[in-house]
């Protein structure tokens, strides 16, 4: 989601990084 505590650009990059980390964790769990 978007964070009102950050500039829009940083919030967007943060969301992308967060989504990537969550996706990696998800696949890591499936790989077990």
UniProtKB/Swiss-Prot annotation:
Domain GH18 per the UniProt entry, residue ranges: 1-32
EC number: 3.2.1.52
Enzyme class: hydrolase
Disulphides: none
Gene Ontology biological-process annotations: carbohydrate metabolic process
Source organism phylogeny: Eukaryota, Metazoa, Cnidaria, Anthozoa, Hexacorallia
Name this polypeptide is given: Beta-hexosaminidase
Domain of life, per lineage: Eukaryota
GO molecular function, one term: beta-N-acetylhexosaminidase activity
Catalytic activity: Hydrolysis of terminal non-reducing N-acetyl-D-hexosamine residues in N-acetyl-beta-D-hexosaminides
